[in-house]
């Protein structure tokens, strides 16, 4: 009971996570912030097809969501932006292992404001630091948020980390990091390619080699405490041809074969 009562305090400490009280009969999904555009569209399509209430989706950093699940937050599904945080909740016995699968792939890119004079960059310490011109590199938290961890790993592999590590503007999730660049508050940032494509106020100035960081994989699973049959149906729908179309439209790589939608 203590954990069940304590999750609310954690939720209040994470202002980017919306209210997550489970409405009667409504599927509750915790999903990485980078999934918002695609998943909102998919949830609406599932609701239209089934006649069920549109799932209530809370978007935030995978790290924040995993911690909320650990504290007993009422979620039916968890969609993480990396394997580490799904492994974390798996290790805590908080998901149903048979339901888990790898759903999507993504890429990370370096972005600048759309009106920036920054040209296409080679990602190395000297050029990246020079392009910052005294400003800061916008990244999601490099120690806990998946896109921040991927970005740090890539910068280390490419020999640029030591030149920029003291010039970071760290945000709570990828959308917050994206916003800093879109507003011109940071001259450069590292985000997923899907987020860059969705924001007209930024442009891509470099793409990170896929071998410069761990594979970007989005796993999905039912939580251990979910008793909703609709949650299983929605999870299955994520593998449907209709969902594939939404994911691919946003630039994700779909890692599962399409299944017939229920």
PLM regions: where:
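N-terminal secretory signal peptides and thylakoid transit peptides that target proteins
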Residues: 1-14
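Exported/periplasmic ABC-transporter solute-binding proteins
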Residues: 22-73, 80-83, 87-262
